């Protein structure tokens, strides 16, 4: 019963207006820029990112834990480390990912709080 209450309560704090935009601005925009285009040749774009789409099932983990090493985004190689943010809650991650979907079409589908919770639970 307590689990159900916690799950329902957490859902109250996702999808709050512009929360995803605020979180993106605070934690992501300094590198990926407000328009999601990244820094050409250094920081990958988030706009229509095939990498975000291919990694949709672990996107919450990537945001929380960061990325090390080389990645390919939209056919271009990037080798700039992305710091993670362990402080982001599951609700924060849900809001950020859904903001990426809404603004940058990446990933192509929205995520639910439950999907993000499962991703975080299974992070390597």
Model-predicted regions and their roles:
Residues 72-124:
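Flexible coil segments in periplasmic/lumen-exposed cytochrome c-class electron-transfer proteins
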Residues 1-6:
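Sec-dependent signal peptide recognition
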Residues 33, 64-68, 98-102:
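Residues at helix-coil transition
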Residues 37-72, 79-87:
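Gly/Gly-Pro-rich "capping" loops immediately C-terminal to redox-active cysteine motifs
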Residues 8-11:
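C-terminal motif of bacterial Sec signal peptides marking the signal peptidase cleavage site
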Residues 25, 48, 118:
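Phosphate-coordinating loops and pocket residues in cytosolic domains that bind phosphorylated ligands
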Residues 15-39, 54-61:
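Sequence/structural segment immediately N-terminal to covalent heme-attachment motifs in c-type
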């Amino acid at each position: 019963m307590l689990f159900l209450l916690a799950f329902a309560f957490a859902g109250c704090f996702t999808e709050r207006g512009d929360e995803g935009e605020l979180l993106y601005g605070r934690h992501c925009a300094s590198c990926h820029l407000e328009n999601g285009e990244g820094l050409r040749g250094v920081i990958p774009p988030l706009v229509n990112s095939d990498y975000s789409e291919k990694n949709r099932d672990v996107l919450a983990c990537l945001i929380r834990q960061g990325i090390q090493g080389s990645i390919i985004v939209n056919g271009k190689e990037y080798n700039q480390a992305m710091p993670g943010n362990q402080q982001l809650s599951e609700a924060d991650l849900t809001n950020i990912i859904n903001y990426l979907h809404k603004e940058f079409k990446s990933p192509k589908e929205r995520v639910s709080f439950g999907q993000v919770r499962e991703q975080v639970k299974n992070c390597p």
